[in-house]
């Protein structure tokens, strides 16, 4: 038996309220579902990516770099770090530095909500957390259709772009060069 819909505040709309069904998945269910997709894709191809959004742009990182996808966690602040490093979280006893990709890419800051997602990635045997607006999907990319680091004026520096791909709906997906995001002097904060 389905529960009746309720009225809930809609943060993304000019409407004050919208109907929400109890049966709609919440943030925890959506993250759990994506975790299962990530596990399945990691066992398949090296051409699988996890997509996420910042503002209206869609970005993707190689699925092999994804260690974990978690909801917002309490962040311990650190002094004397760049503004895009929000601090560290304790992930099962390991301190993981957290980078807000909006700030790293020069976008305006956004308040964290229950839908904010932390992508935990492993680069050179180090864990790093990336704050993203939301995680969208698992995408299998045909490498022959990737345009390598195009010369265009984008919101982010091209040093963080590995390439650009058009998905099945002809929407542009920006492939992020995860190792390029990490400069050793910026990431020693969690390993002192």
What feature does the model see in each segment?
Residues 1-192:
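An acidic, low-aromatic, low-complexity terminal/linker signal
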């Amino acid at each position: 038996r389905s529960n009746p819909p309720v009225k809930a505040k809609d943060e993304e709309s000019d409407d004050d309220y919208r109907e929400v069904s109890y049966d709609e998945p919440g943030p925890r269910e959506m993250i759990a579902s994506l975790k299962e997709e990530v596990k399945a894709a990691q066992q398949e191809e090296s051409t699988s990516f996890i997509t996420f959004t910042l503002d209206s742009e869609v970005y993707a990182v190689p699925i092999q770099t994804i260690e974990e996808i978690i909801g917002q966690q309490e962040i311990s602040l650190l002094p004397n770090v760049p503004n895009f490093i929000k601090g560290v979280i304790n992930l099962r006893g390991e301190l993981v530095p957290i980078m807000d990709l909006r700030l790293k890419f020069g976008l305006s800051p956004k308040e964290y909500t229950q839908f904010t997602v932390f992508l935990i990635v492993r680069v050179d045997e180090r864990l790093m957390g990336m704050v993203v607006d939301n995680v969208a999907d698992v995408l299998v990319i045909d490498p022959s259709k990737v345009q390598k680091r195009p010369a265009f004026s984008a919101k982010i520096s091209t040093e963080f772009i590995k390439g650009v791909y058009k998905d099945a709906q002809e929407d542009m997906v920006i492939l992020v060069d995860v190792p390029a995001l990490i400069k050793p002097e910026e990431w020693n904060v969690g390993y002192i």
